[in-house]
């Protein structure tokens, strides 16, 4: 609540106060609160409503972690990170024709959370796609329905069908899954590199996992020296 926030503002005046009042904790320590949030309780870990839970990799005790995602986290961290990366790219590439084409955004899927009304759990990328400004849908591919498909192989085929003949100027996604999609599209079209399919491709935004292990493979499928890559997408944590 705002009253509780005011109390903390008075009690936390510097980093040492913050560290003492809010020490680092493991997922297991906060899990009881997460479970209560998933059951519909509010104002436990954050003062605004929590409706979304990002499903992350497991711990030693659990198969998966369910990380609460607030509206503020979406706006002030994830979407702002994307805007910052785009702004840096435009500053460094003033002749960019980024907006002459569309962005291929590769995401995961989401599902209802414990049958709780208006609450969903899923991949962070799916949560971002679900909540993004509707205007973005006019400048990206594939369709939202296709982007949020659950099963991976049919999803790759559907994305390929929707994007092969599109004018794609930019890519966004996790390097590992994006590479799988790229190879599928190249195999489907019989082409050797993405420039043969999307001649106006100029930038790849990536994140979630390190890009370095995939760098050489990307050089094989994106051969143009004008196409650059930027890391900006945050992971769940």
Residue ranges of model-derived segments:
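A short, hydrophobic C-terminal helix/tail in secreted or cell-surface proteins
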Residues: 4, 235-237
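Conserved A3 ("GATE") glycine/threonine-rich loop of ANL adenylate-forming enzymes
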Residues: 198-215, 222-234
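Charged/polar positions on well-ordered alpha helices
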Residues: 58-59, 237
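Nucleotide 5′-phosphate-binding alpha/beta core
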Residues: 1-55, 61-203, 212-216
């Amino acid at each position: 609540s705002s009253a509780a926030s005011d109390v903390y503002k008075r009690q936390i005046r510097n980093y040492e106060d913050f560290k003492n009042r809010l020490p680092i904790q493991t997922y297991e320590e906060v899990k009881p609160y997460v479970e209560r949030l998933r059951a519909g309780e509010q104002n436990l870990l954050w003062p605004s409503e929590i409706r979304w839970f990002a499903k992350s990799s497991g711990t030693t005790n659990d198969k998966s972690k369910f990380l609460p995602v607030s509206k503020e986290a979406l706006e002030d961290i994830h979407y702002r990170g994307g805007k910052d990366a785009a702004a840096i790219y435009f500053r460094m590439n003033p002749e960019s024709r980024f907006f002459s084409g569309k962005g291929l955004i590769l995401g995961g899927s989401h599902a209802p959370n414990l049958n709780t009304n208006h609450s969903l759990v899923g991949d962070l990328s799916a949560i971002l796609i679900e909540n993004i400004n509707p205007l973005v849908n006019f400048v990206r591919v594939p369709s939202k329905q296709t982007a949020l498909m659950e099963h991976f192989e049919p999803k790759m085929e559907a994305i390929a069908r929707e994007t092969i003949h599109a004018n794609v100027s930019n890519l966004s996604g996790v390097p590992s899954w994006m590479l799988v999609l790229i190879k599928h599209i190249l195999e489907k079209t019989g082409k050797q590199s993405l420039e043969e399919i999307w001649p106006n491709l100029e930038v790849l935004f990536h994140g979630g996992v390190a890009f370095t292990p995939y760098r050489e493979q990307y050089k094989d499928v994106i051969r143009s020296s004008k196409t650059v890559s930027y890391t900006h997408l945050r992971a769940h944590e």
